[in-house]
């Protein structure tokens, strides 16, 4: 199982065309072993992006069942909640809820991505889709 952490980072970014700076808050989803590892991976990512003056504002554990990246059609991150009824022979049906983090260019394409993932293997219902504040995923 993935240990996913949401890491909020604050830094100053130069404004285009002026000498001023603007405050930027970004949220990174980090696959890490611990809070310390999540912070270390975030610091390494910020250094790769040549951002040296920043502050890790908060770190919290996230409970996503799956994180689906989309290299060809990405851009924004969405939270999706999917409910399914799983039933084995002779047993009562069990409701399973999955929280997904999905990268897509538009909210309308999220349902396509979910149907590609689940397909016809389980009957499911898409409960909710919302825009996430995640800026980037660090593996």
Q: Which residues fall in each region the model found?
A:
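Short, structured motif recognition centered on aromatic/hydrophobic residues
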Residues: 3-9, 26-29, 38, 42, ...
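Short amphipathic alpha-helical linker/capping segments at the junctions of internal repeats
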Residues: 27, 52-65, 122-137
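A short, charged, amphipathic alpha-helix used as a generic interaction element across diverse proteins
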Residues: 34-50, 106-121
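A cross-family "folded-core" feature that marks the main globular domain of proteins
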Residues: 4, 8, 20, 41, ...
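Mixed-charge, glycine-accented linear interaction segment located at domain edges/termini
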Residues: 92-94, 98-138
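A cross-kingdom feature marking solvent-exposed beta-strand/loop segments within repeated
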Residues: 13-30, 48, 91-100, 118
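Beta-strand elements of well-folded, non-transmembrane domains
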Residues: 11-15, 31-34, 82-88, 102-106
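Intrinsic, low-complexity N-terminal interaction/targeting segments
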Residues: 53-90
């Amino acid at each position: 199982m993935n240990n996913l952490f949401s890491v909020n980072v604050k830094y100053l970014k130069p404004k285009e065309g002026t000498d001023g700076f603007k405050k930027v808050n970004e949220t990174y989803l980090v696959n890490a072993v611990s809070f310390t590892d999540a912070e270390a991976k975030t610091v390494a990512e910020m250094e790769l992006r040549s951002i040296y003056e920043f502050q890790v504002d908060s770190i919290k554990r996230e409970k996503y069942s799956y994180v689906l990246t989309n290299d060809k059609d990405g851009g924004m991150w969405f939270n999706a909640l999917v409910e399914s009824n799983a039933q084995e022979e002779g047993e009562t049906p069990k409701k399973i809820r999955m929280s997904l983090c999905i990268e897509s260019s538009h909210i309308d394409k999220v349902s396509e991505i979910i149907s590609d993932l689940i397909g016809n293997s389980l009957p499911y219902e898409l409960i909710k889709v919302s825009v996430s504040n995640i800026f980037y995923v660090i593996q």
